[in-house]
Curated annotation (Swiss-Prot):
Keywords: Glycoprotein, Membrane, Signal, Transmembrane, Transmembrane helix, Virion
Residues with attached carbohydrate: N185, N263, N289, N378, N416
Origin superkingdom: Viruses
One BP annotation, GO: symbiont-mediated perturbation of host process
Annotated function: Attaches the virus to host cellular receptor and later induces fusion of virion with host membrane.
Transmembrane segment boundaries: 479-502
Keyword Membrane: yes
Stated name of the protein: Envelope glycoprotein
Biological source species: Thogoto virus (isolate SiAr 126)
Subcellular localization(s) per the UniProt record: Virion membrane
Predominant localisation class: virion
Residues spanning the signal sequence: 1-15
Amino acid sequence: MFLQTALLLLSLGVAEPDCNTKTATGPYILDRYKPKPVTVSKKLYSATRYTTSAQNELLTAGYRTAWVAYCYNGGLVDSNTGCNARLLHYPPSRDELLLWGSSHQCSYGDICHDCWGSDSYACLGQLDPAKHWAPRKELVRRDANWKFAYHMCNIDWRCGVTTSPVFFNLQWVKNEVKVSTLLPNGSTVEHSAGEPLFWTEKDFSYLVKDNFEIQREEVKISCFVDPDYWVGERKTKKAFCQDGTNFFEVTSHQFCHQYACYNFSKDELLEAVYKERAHEKSKDLPFGNKSWTVVTASIDDLHALSAAQAFELEGLRASFAELDSRFRQLSEILDTVISSIAKIDERLIGRLIKAPVSSRFISEDKFLLHQCVDSVANNTNCVGDSAYVDGRWTHVGDNHPCTTVVDEPIGIDIYNFSALWYPSAAEVDFRGTVQSEDGWSFVVKSKDALIQTMMYTKNGGKGTSLTDLLDYPSGWLKGQLGGLLYGNIGVYLLIAFAFVLLIRLIKSAGLC
């Protein structure tokens, strides 16, 4: 026994002839890598979801306006000469708008062009706005009077109607989910689902109808919550969630995103997010109280967003390069460990490459592989004449009996890793802006048409052409000249009297 121990110590001493065991430094321990703590967490949160079966409501928009110009031509000396011209708004009533929408036509009143004398009384009476029908009509502005010493009346109408689907949002209003109709100016109008909404604005009338109900269901919403979310130099708390193809940021336990509203159950982590975001009111938002659906991005905005994404991308590239470098270091360390252990466990390399081979090292880093018996049975330690005992394959014998495993082995997880989240592509619906919808673009174009009409006066206004001058009625020139001549005869008499008086004064003074 003593001889065996001496030989073992001698062999150990010979194995490391270049190591000085008489001097040492330390002690040391293997230090572990301490990554930056990750505060973001992913969790399923319970919520009550309110949704609708449709994504559009039906908008009917109609307008009606009358142009009334009551003029008198009494010449320059008559202070009553001039025109009283105005636009009168006659928005259709609710019943009228329903009829307009179903017939795709609008109604308007009588037209009066250059009505003079007793016919000019049409401008003084009550106008009947529903006597004629047309798919659409634009007025012509007239405010001239070519009849001296007479009144003249000009009445014309404009009207139009459209019916088209428009999108909407759902919104919490006093703990109740309402339908929020989005208007082109950025404001919203809330109403209950299934209840038509009617309102007027100057010469326009609007009717919004929907045929859906708000459905309620209990769901699980997947959210990433980060209590240490950095925005530049400012730290805040954020919660980003996904519900199917919808992605949104949650700022309160009652939250809405387009066609869905959520009432989240109480959660300590989410409550901290709500408290942090409570001070961010609508006045602090970039666009105030306006709906974000009316705001469009400029080229500069897109360039700024692209630059921010490029910066983040470069940061990711640098992080991946660092990870790749660390992985290479780990691979080198692991190769060294495997090489060292494989000199003791000759089957290690075979198990790693999934081949029935054993290794035999012939130098520090070079080895040979030997073919071995392939283990095909997984419920016994014996294969043919070989038995697996104490981590080694040996011959079956009295000292190495075969053992059969009857019970299914129980797995032991020594890592306790949680499952990774794998992102998946989702189709996001883009709605565009409110102004781009057919119904609201009709309203905008109609208002622009009225502005252009008011800039152009028939017979002598903006854009006058030879054809326009020839459109003057017969007698117009005579009326203008007559008004100029007869309406100013008093002026001419005064000038003649002053001239005669001046001559008499000169003669009496002996100057001529």
